[in-house]
């Protein structure tokens, strides 16, 4: 079959081409913000519009276009949706076996204040899970935990998405940084160092921001010591580990340092006023729970599903385990690779997005054993045995999990179908090239490219795979550091995570807000844009004023 070459400027004018390319994204924003459509409806129509743009404007062959949609949809089911199914199942086991009341009580014994619970669960525990697993699992698990602690579901999901900004760049054992190094040929250690000189500023701002969203200026004034302990210890550990150890461990190290510092600090200090959301009858439940005293053994047993989850996910993420399933590894036969018909190596990515014309691979990987979701399922099975849950109850719980998640899973599939048609048609690259045409102002717009990549794909890793080499090329054209621009793609990407349709579908699924995706999108969108502008300002200062900060 003939190789179809991507054309990034079909209109002959990059601004006009990018306007047409942005139609599906503009529709998606409009559908959620103004029309208030349900997530799966908005995603389905977005795929239809993206297909129309790919076929009519980019002249993509019909078979390639349809193949990319199907490939994206299946990628949404596995590995993405599989992670959510397993994560929600672990949470439900904890609730069904009655252990969740003890977890709640143990957190309440550290602090009954929901602003500080947000720091412990949403920030510290969430950052740890991001470092180990990434790909949506942290938001699903922490948001569900917070709803169990009496948080309003919309706030739990929205706040977890926003606070997840801090750890995303080093998520899943530093994969976004390692991928950026692979696609650009730059040293991933240096990219990690640069990200570690941008993100710590954002981390502390984000935590104060979260306090302000929850409880206004009063909340900031009352909680600033705890925020400085949690955010300050995290930021310092993030800087040191990324600059002196490497990009794999900053999240794991920083989150553990922050969790220990914050817990010890809260043993000595509590805010003058205890803040709780005044709804869902949460406070009545909590008084009785807080009065119940549990032994250390009971508390450890109650947390066991999440301890198992932490252990299995960490094991699955370590390089020796991953190497078993890599080409040439002892268990490589366990990974099923299927080249996507009508698509694999039939589309060519062209300069300036890549250095030379490159056939775009499309291989569907069914890693039934080495997927993160399977690691979480193992944690669920260990929990069932350890907590002596009846097999019939466990099967029923798994069934109800699947039933509840059916629509969100469809949404995630459609969102990834849109991401893949955008990538294979060249639509996403047109938008990227338009941003790269902004000349010396590109240092400010560079993070928006990462933001766009994560919005489209739901992953900082995928955003770097798409746009990191373009960032490096643009940097050389305007005479600034390529390491800085590639790092800005990664750091800007983290701010897009909170509005990425994939993240929103996952968060809504975890807290039972299916069909309310538009509410969650409206909750996070302004914060996302403000943070991206902040990263743009930091990057521009580092490019032209604070050049000594570049490694």
From Swiss-Prot:
Q: Which residues cross the membrane?
A: 13-33, 37-57, 69-89, 131-151, 159-179, 194-214, 244-264, 306-326, 366-386, 405-425, 438-458, 530-550
Family according to the record: Belongs to the lactate permease family.
Say if the entry is tagged with keyword Endoplasmic reticulum.
Answer: no
Q: How does it sit in the membrane?
A: Multi-pass membrane protein
Q: Which organism is it from?
A: Salmonella typhimurium (strain LT2 / SGSC1412 / ATCC 700720)
**UniProt-listed Pfam families:** Lactate_perm
For this entry, the protein name equals: L-lactate permease
Q: Name one GO molecular function term.
A: solute:proton symporter activity
What reaction(s) does this enzyme catalyze?
Answer: (S)-lactate(in) + H(+)(in) = (S)-lactate(out) + H(+)(out); (R)-lactate(in) + H(+)(in) = (R)-lactate(out) + H(+)(out); glycolate(in) + H(+)(in) = glycolate(out) + H(+)(out)
What superkingdom heads the lineage? Bacteria
**What does this protein's UniProt record list under function?**
Uptake of L-lactate across the membrane. Can also transport D-lactate and glycolate. Seems to be driven by a proton motive force.
Compartments, record wording: Cell inner membrane
What keywords is this UniProt entry annotated with? Cell inner membrane, Cell membrane, Membrane, Symport, Transmembrane, Transmembrane helix, Transport
**Entry GO CC:** plasma membrane
Note the SS bond partners. Answer: none
* InterPro entries for this protein: Lactate_perm (IPR003804)
């Amino acid at each position: 079959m003939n190789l179809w070459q991507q054309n990034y400027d079909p209109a002959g004018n990059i601004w006009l081409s990018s306007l047409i390319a942005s139609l599906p994204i503009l529709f998606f924003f409009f559908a959620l913000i103004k029309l208030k459509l349900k997530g799966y409806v908005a995603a389905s129509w977005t795929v239809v519009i993206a297909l129309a743009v790919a076929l009519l404007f980019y002249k993509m062959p019909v078979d390639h276009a349809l193949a990319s949609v199907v490939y994206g949809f299946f990628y949404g089911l596995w590995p993405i949706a599989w992670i959510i199914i397993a994560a929600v199942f672990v949470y439900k086991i904890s609730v069904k076996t009655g252990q969740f009341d003890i977890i709640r009580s143990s957190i309440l014994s550290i602090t009954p204040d929901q602003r500080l619970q947000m720091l412990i669960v949403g920030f510290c525990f969430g950052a740890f899970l991001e470092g180990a697993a990434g790909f949506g699992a942290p938001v699903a698990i922490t948001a569900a935990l917070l709803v169990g602690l009496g948080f309003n579901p919309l706030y739990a999901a929205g706040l977890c998405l926003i606070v997840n900004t801090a750890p995303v760049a080093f998520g899943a054992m530093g994969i976004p940084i390692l991928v950026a190094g692979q696609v650009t040929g730059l040293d991933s250690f240096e990219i990690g160092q640069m990200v570690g000189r941008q993100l710590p500023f954002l981390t502390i701002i984000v935590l104060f921001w979260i306090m302000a969203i929850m409880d206004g200026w009063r909340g900031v004034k009352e909680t600033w010591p705890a925020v400085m302990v949690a955010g300050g210890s995290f930021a310092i550990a993030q800087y040191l580990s990324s600059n002196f150890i490497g990009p794999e461990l900053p999240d794991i190290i920083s989150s553990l340092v922050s969790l220990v510092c914050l817990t010890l600090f809260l043993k000595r200090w509590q805010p003058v006023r205890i803040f709780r959301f005044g709804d869902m009858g949460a406070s009545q439940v909590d008084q009785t729970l807080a009065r119940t005293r549990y032994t250390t053994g009971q508390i450890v047993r109650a947390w066991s599903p999440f301890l198992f989850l932490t252990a299995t996910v960490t094991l699955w993420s370590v390089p020796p385990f991953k190497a078993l399933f890599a080409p040439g590894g002892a268990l490589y036969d366990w990974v099923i690779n299927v080249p996507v018909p009508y698509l694999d190596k039939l589309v060519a990515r062209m300069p300036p997005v890549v250095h030379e014309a490159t056939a775009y691979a499309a291989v569907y990987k069914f890693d039934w054993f080495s997927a993160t979701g399977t690691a979480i399922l193992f944690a669920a099975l260990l929990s069932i045995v350890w907590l002596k849950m009846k097999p019939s109850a466990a099967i029923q719980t798994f069934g109800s999990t699947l039933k509840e998640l059916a629509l969100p899973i469809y949404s995630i599939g459609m969102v990834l179908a849109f991401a893949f048609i955008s990538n294979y048609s060249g639509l996403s690259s047109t938008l990227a090239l338009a941003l790269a045409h902004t000349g010396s102002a590109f240092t400010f717009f560079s993070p928006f490219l990462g933001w766009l990549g994560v919005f489209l794909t739901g992953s900082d890793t995928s955003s770097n795979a798409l746009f990191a080499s373009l960032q490096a090329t643009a940097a050389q054209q305007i005479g600034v550091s390529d390491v800085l621009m590639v790092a800005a793609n990664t750091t800007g990407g983290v701010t897009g995570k909170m509005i990425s349709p994939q993240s929103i579908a996952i968060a809504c699924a975890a807290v039972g807000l299916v069909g309310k995706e538009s509410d969650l999108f409206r909750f996070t969108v302004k914060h996302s844009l403000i943070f991206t502008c902040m990263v743009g300002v930091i990057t521009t200062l580092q490019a032209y004023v604070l050049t000594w900060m570049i490694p």
